[in-house]
């Protein structure tokens, strides 16, 4: 049986919020079967919980924000991408502020944290959402689509009219049956253009952003001294974001996601449309792991 997974141990980290610039303490904790991923604002009394579900998404400008009443958690997508990539079904994410720390701008540090905590299988079947037919949302020339696929595949195309990106790969397709999330996607960093950063800062966004946690691009090239981690790091980061946004379904997917210039808002619209169209998907479990179209790395012992 493919079983649900949680963390073996509690683990902590410190970072800054990308948009707020505030110092944030992050604690990842094991959670019982069928809990899902639940964010907790531990700085509030009483503590406020926000389950990582599509229905709880509020703001989608520049990042994905979860809300519960007037309480929010910003920039959840990179951590959720790491949870999805490692197959974590159940965990508590405690925060000392309203934003998940940006770390280095990728999912890599979160993958390291989760692997350091160790993974533990639980005594219940892992639930997958299998896509049964095409579901699409469009907005202007942007598009996001789910398609049936025996496995998990993410295809993405971006179209930035910028001298640096025009000459680089702006599309990628990753089939996770043959490609490692950890090696090929998790280290892709968020990116920003110098021309936008002043505008963002005027609106109290990207206050914690720097070349330490993003790829910064001006008219002449990439400003980061070490350059890019992947030749197609820009579009790979969009794939990383999409995987995090899709995990707000609450389960791992069996299907293909295709995005054309899609972002957090359109990704969330697609999830809401899918959830509403109950004939477009089904929940499945696998008694025999060898029959599943998706496999996960064996749980690793805590470091």
UniProtKB/Swiss-Prot annotation:
The active site is at 264 (proton donor). The keyword Lipid biosynthesis applies. It comes from Pseudomonas putida (strain GB-1). This is UDP-3-O-acyl-N-acetylglucosamine deacetylase. SUPFAM superfamilies: Ribosomal protein S5 domain 2-like (SSF54211). GO terms for biological process: lipid A biosynthetic process. Catalyzes the hydrolysis of UDP-3-O-myristoyl-N-acetylglucosamine to form UDP-3-O-myristoylglucosamine and acetate, the committed step in lipid A biosynthesis. NCBIfam families: lpxC (TIGR00325).
């Amino acid at each position: 049986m493919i079983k649900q997974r949680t963390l073996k141990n509690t683990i902590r980290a410190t970072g800054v919020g990308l948009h707020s610039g505030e110092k944030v303490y992050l604690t990842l904790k094991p959670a019982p079967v069928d809990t899902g991923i639940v964010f907790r604002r531990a700085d509030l009394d009483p503590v406020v919980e926000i389950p990582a579900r599509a229905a709880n998404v509020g703001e989608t400008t520049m990042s994905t924000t979860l809300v519960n009443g007037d309480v929010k958690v910003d920039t959840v997508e990179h951590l959720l991408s790491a949870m999805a990539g490692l197959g974590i079904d159940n965990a508590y994410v405690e925060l000392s502020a309203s934003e998940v720390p940006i770390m280095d701008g990728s999912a890599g540090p979160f993958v390291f944290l989760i692997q350091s905590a160790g993974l533990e299988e639980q005594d219940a079947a892992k639930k997958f959402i299998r896509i049964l037919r095409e579901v699409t949302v469009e907005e202007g020339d942007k598009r996001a689509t789910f398609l049936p696929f025996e496995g998990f595949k993410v295809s993405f195309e971006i179209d930035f009219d910028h001298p640096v990106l025009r000459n680089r790969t702006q599309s990628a397709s990753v089939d996770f049956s043959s490609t490692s999330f950890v090696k090929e996607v998790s280290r892709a960093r968020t990116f920003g253009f110098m021309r936008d950063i002043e505008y963002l800062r005027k609106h109290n966004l990207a206050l914690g952003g720097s070349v330490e946690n993003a790829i910064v691009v001006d008219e002449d090239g990439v400003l980061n001294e070490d350059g890019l981690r992947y030749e197609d790091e820009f579009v790979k980061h969009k794939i990383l974001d999409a995987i995090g946004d899709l995990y707000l379904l609450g389960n791992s997917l069996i299907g293909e996601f295709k995005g054309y210039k899609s972002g957090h808002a359109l990704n969330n619209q697609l999830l809401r449309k899918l959830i509403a169209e109950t004939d477009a998907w089904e929940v499945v479990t696998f008694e025999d792991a060898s029959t599943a179209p998706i496999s996960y790395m064996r749980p690793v012992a805590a470091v």
